[in-house]
UniProtKB/Swiss-Prot annotation:
InterPro entries cross-referenced by the UniProt entry: DadA (IPR023080), FAD-dep_OxRdtase (IPR006076), FAD/NAD-bd_sf (IPR036188)
Any one Gene Ontology BP term: D-alanine catabolic process
Enzyme class: oxidoreductase
Catalytic activity: a D-alpha-amino acid + A + H2O = a 2-oxocarboxylate + AH2 + NH4(+)
Source organism (scientific name): Burkholderia pseudomallei (strain 1106a)
Taxonomy, superkingdom: Bacteria
GO cellular component, one term: plasma membrane
This protein's name: D-amino acid dehydrogenase
PANTHER family hit by this protein: D-AMINO ACID DEHYDROGENASE (PTHR13847:SF280), SARCOSINE DEHYDROGENASE-RELATED (PTHR13847)
Source taxonomy: Bacteria, Pseudomonadati, Pseudomonadota, Betaproteobacteria, Burkholderiales
Pathway linked to the protein: Amino-acid degradation; D-alanine degradation; NH(3) and pyruvate from D-alanine: step 1/1
UniProtKB keywords: FAD, Flavoprotein, Oxidoreductase
SUPFAM superfamilies associated with the record: FAD-linked reductases, C-terminal domain, FAD/NAD(P)-binding domain
Length: 428
């Protein structure tokens, strides 16, 4: 089958790789000059299945009000003037219950754990290198309330059989020796030894090269204008003056997926703006070993070979990609507070990206009401964590195979309701 994939981020490239492995003829189209040059370019660098959790959580609405008045708040909201933003935020609020949080986190962990298994198999088969580390991830708490609040996450981890370690403040240095100097600031931590880290952009670039060896064709610097429809199916992709045709089409354009498919299916994928800095390491003994997640500021600090990546925060501001110095200040504050002297933040590069977020945190992977149109989008802050599993799952669905994990609750159909013959997001 001839397949066109729109988008060459980590999710699009992973989709291409697994579809090509399944024997399909794949073409990837993207407006950028190469793979992973947008949202996948400088993310936090973590592969964290156990920490897969929706931003929509109990207590978040009240926290959001408090964060409005804090200098280093992890969440900021600015109205963009669209009805879609208001609808999206309302649906996110409806997912901030204990019951829905557990449901959403459970299926996110299911996909993320499967994806990590797929990545490990890929690494064993291809020996792909991307400055990866397998030292686990450590979530650190600054208050007793945060430590006590980890109980709801631990319950989900137990149910999913995910290994974990609950550490006291004195025990944190066993996982991250450099934290010994600041352990008095922390109340404890939750460590997931099975998590991994690495450079997502490097991984995606090298996976694209492996995909090319399987016959995948990449068309970069190509504008994607519209999907052409005929007879109730996709007839092609309008790229400037050219119509690119195939048997099936996969939209993996992250936050830009929503507008492209709007006339065909309404998907609640909204851009969640995040930031990162990447600093050179100046003292390895004072730098992290793997990834450390600061629960207070919702910031991840990740060790690469000779660099530290610090990423996080969330702004609900539409497609605004302006770099804000105050956000850089927050990232620098966090890494210098936990790992003083580890990296040279004065020489750090500063970046922002738009994560494609659904209101319930779970991505949209699979079929749509349009017979030959498939989606692989909405992974939020977990694009790399879920990329290999999402790509393999999609390849199975498109090849007529039964996926290894449950997939029905990952498709767009969980959002659709029939109203006057139209498919609309189910906001009720």
């Amino acid at each position: 089958m001839r397949v066109v994939i729109l988008g060459s981020g980590v999710v699009g490239v992973a989709s291409a790789y697994y579809l090509a492995r399944a024997g399909h003829e794949v073409t990837v189209i993207d407006r950028e000059a190469g793979p992973a040059l947008d949202t996948s370019f400088a993310n936090a660098g973590q592969i964290s299945p156990g920490y897969a959790a929706p931003w929509a959580a109990p207590g978040v609405p009240l926290k959001a009000v408090k964060w409005m008045f804090e200098k280093h708040a992890p969440l900021a909201i600015r109205l963009d003037g669209t009805r879609f933003q208001l609808q999206w935020m309302w649906q996110m609020l409806r997912n901030c219950t204990t019951e829905r949080y557990a449901l959403n986190k459970g299926r996110m962990v299911r996909l993320a754990e499967y994806s990590r298994d797929c990545l490990q198999a890929l690494r064993a088969e291809t020996a792909i290198q991307y400055e990866g580390r397998t030292g686990g991830t450590l979530q650190v708490f600054r208050t007793q309330q945060q430590l006590d609040g980890a109980a709801k996450d631990i319950a989900v981890l137990r149910e999913a059989n995910v290994p974990f370690e609950l550490l006291s403040s004195d025990e944190l240095k066993k996982a991250e020796p450099a934290l010994a100097a600041v352990s008095h600031k922390l109340t404890g931590g939750l460590r997931l030894p099975g998590d991994e880290t690495g450079d997502c952009q490097l991984f995606t670039t090298r996976l694209a090269a492996l995909a090319e060896q399987l016959g995948v064709k990449f068309r970069f610097n190509t504008r994607i204008d519209a999907l052409a429809v005929a007879g109730g199916k996709i007839a092609g992709v309008q790229c400037g003056g050219e119509m690119v045709r195939a048997d099936a089409y996969v939209v993996a354009l992250g936050s830009y997926s929503t507008n492209l498919v709007a006339s065909l299916v309404k998907i609640p994928v909204y851009p969640l703006k995040g930031y990162s800095i990447t600093a050179p390491i100046v003292d390895a003994a004072k730098a992290p070993v793997s990834t450390v997640l600061d629960e207070t500021y919702k910031i991840a600090i990740t060790r690469f070979d000779d660099r530290i990546r610090v990423g996080g925060m969330a702004e609900i501001v539409g497609f605004d990609k302006r770099l804000r110095d105050a956000r850089r200040g927050t990232l620098e504050m966090c890494v210098n507070d936990l790992f003083p002297g580890g990296g040279d933040t004065a020489k750090a590069t500063f970046w922002t990206g738009l994560r494609p977020m659904t209101p319930d945190g779970t991505p949209i992977v699979g079929r749509t009401p349009v017979p030959n149109l498939f989606l692989n989008t909405g992974h939020g802050t977990l694009g790399w964590t879920m990329s290999c599993g999402s790509g393999q799952l999609l390849a199975d669905l498109m090849s007529g195979k039964k996926p290894v994990i449950r997939a029905d609750d990952l498709s767009v159909h969980r959002y659709l309701s029939e109203t006057d013959g139209e498919h609309r997001p189910a906001y009720a």
